[in-house]
Design a protein with these regions (language model features):
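Thiamine diphosphate
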Residues: 3-130, 136-367, 372-374, 442, 447-449, ...
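Short glycine/serine/threonine-rich phosphate/pyrophosphate-binding segments
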Residues: 1-5, 253-257, 280-283, 410-414
Length: 458
């Protein structure tokens, strides 16, 4: 269903450098497509302002003609619908046709069906991987053509680089994947602010200091406070792509996938935002970002039950556990597959954003509050948040109990600690914005924060 959102956005923005092929063979894994849908795909895309070309998808000349036509289209993307035959040329064991059969969708041909199919396609079953002379000649000719095309491209690039050294250096830096330089010292947070508002202040600085950053919101920029970024730039429109903000509309999965695409392309830093409870709609994309090690920044606000008048449909309960599970899973390189950060107050929010921008190897989750949060006690060393968990200033020596939390619950622990201290109980409060980061520290550090055998709540 991602095609719905992507199709709408591409048509709305008039992306005429986009050509999409649709293999329309009327067959799916379990049934023919007419068993589950009667929609007119061509009319649907035309309604989204796409140019639609329908061809015989098994005809190479028709494909080339359609591509040539599509390249000439301006002001809108193009969909090429190729009406094809599923399993074209395939034969069953009894040598009857295997075309337009659901069984060929995901199963390999074997036995006599395999032999009969190779024969039917003009091949030799005893030498099935033979390369026909005409195919070999075609590819050799194309290889030489491509060498010339590539050489011309490199020559043009070298000429442009020589004429535009500053832009060339900037382009190289952006595509290097290195973390951008940001003057974090200019960010002044307001004590007691909601962490979503603190995030807005950071985003305002990033909008002016990180030229290749693009932020998106699923119709919630005023609430998730990505408007802090938007106010320093403007949203993309069909006729103006000079801004750095994508208004995705109510389409969380589409928005997330767009950011994954930007990250895969390279050269830009992509971030997207919505309410934390709606991260459920984005899970497939989040999972893919973790698998592909894409440094997309996921901004999720309204992180607890204090979300206002919307009620339980907007109150995230299980979402944090789900996202933090991904932080514990290792990727193919053996690293945490995701960095999850839930800051305790406005100042810790700045540190969280710094960690997010410096994380260039995995996706980052930034989880912020809707409600205002009291700052942690004076003298708190927020730089320690980079270790995932640390002892909050004002904690007692030799504590009777250690209270651990992240986000807005840390200030709740502070209030509770005052009551416990009146009863003579010594309290250590630990802010743990990232369990994954904390568990990546040395055993000595972990034990210094939460000693083995200590009484721990949280």
């Amino acid at each position: 269903e991602i095609s719905q959102g992507a199709g709408r956005l591409a048509g709305h923005l008039g992306l005429d450098n986009l050509i999409m092929f649709y293999d329309s063979n009327d067959i799916q894994l379990s049934t023919a497509t007419d068993a589950v849908t009667s929609e007119d795909v061509a009319k649907k895309y035309e309604a989204w302002h796409w140019k639609v070309i329908t061809i015989d998808g098994n005809d190479p000349d028709a494909i080339r003609t359609a591509l040539t036509e599509a390249k000439a289209v301006t002001g809108q993307p193009t969909l090429i619908i190729g009406k094809t035959i599923m399993g074209k040329g395939a034969r069953k064991a009894d040598d009857s046709s295997y075309e337009r059969n659901c069984a060929t969708h995901g199963a390999p041909l074997g036995g006599d069906a395999y032999i009969n199919t190779i024969k039917n396609l003009g091949g030799d079953p005893t030498n099935p991987f033979q390369i026909f002379p005409e195919v070999k000649e075609l590819y050799a000719k194309r290889a030489e053509e491509l060498k010339k095309i590539v050489a011309e491209k490199y020559a043009a690039k070298a000429e442009w680089t020589k004429a535009n050294p500053e832009l060339a250096a900037k382009l190289e830096l952006w595509f290097s994947g290195k973390a951008p330089k940001v003057n974090w010292n200019v960010i002044e947070q307001k004590a007691g602010d909601a962490t979503r508002s603190a995030s807005a202040k950071v985003l305002g600085v990033l909008a002016t200091e990180v030229e290749n950053m693009i932020v998106s919101s699923a119709d919630l920029s005023n609430s998730d406070k990505t408007d802090g970024f938007l106010k320093k730039t403007h949203a993309f429109t069909k006729d103006d792509f000079t801004g750095a903000f994508l208004q995705a509309g109510v389409s969380e999965l589409t928005m997330a996938c767009c950011c994954l695409g930007m990250a895969l392309h390279g050269g830009v830093i992509a971030a997207c935002a919505t309410f934390f409870v709606f991260s459920d709609y984005m899970k497939p994309a989040i999972r893919m970002a973790a698998l592909m090690e894409l440094p997309v920044k996921f901004i999720w606000t309204h992180d607890a039950f204090r979300v206002g008048e919307d009620g339980p449909t907007h109150e995230p309960v299980e979402q944090e556990a789900q996202i933090r599970l991904m932080e514990k899973l290792k990727n193919h390189k053996g690293h945490n597959s995701m960095l999850v950060l839930r800051p305790a107050d406005a100042e810790e929010t700045t540190v969280a954003w710094k960690l997010a921008m410096e994380n260039t190897s995995t996706p980052t989750a930034l989880i912020f509050s809707r409600q205002n949060i009291a700052n942690l006690p004076a003298g708190n060393d927020y730089s320690q948040a980079a270790k995932g968990a640390y002892i909050v200033a004002g904690s007692d020596e030799n504590p009777d109990v250690i209270l651990v939390a992240s986000g807005s619950e840390v200030s709740t622990l502070e209030a509770g600690a005052e009551l416990l201290r009146k009863d003579g109980i010594k309290i250590r409060i630990v802010s743990a914005p990232s369990e994954g980061l904390f568990r990546s520290q040395s055993k000595e550090y972990q034990n210094s924060i939460i000693p083995t055998g200590a009484k721990v709540f949280g």
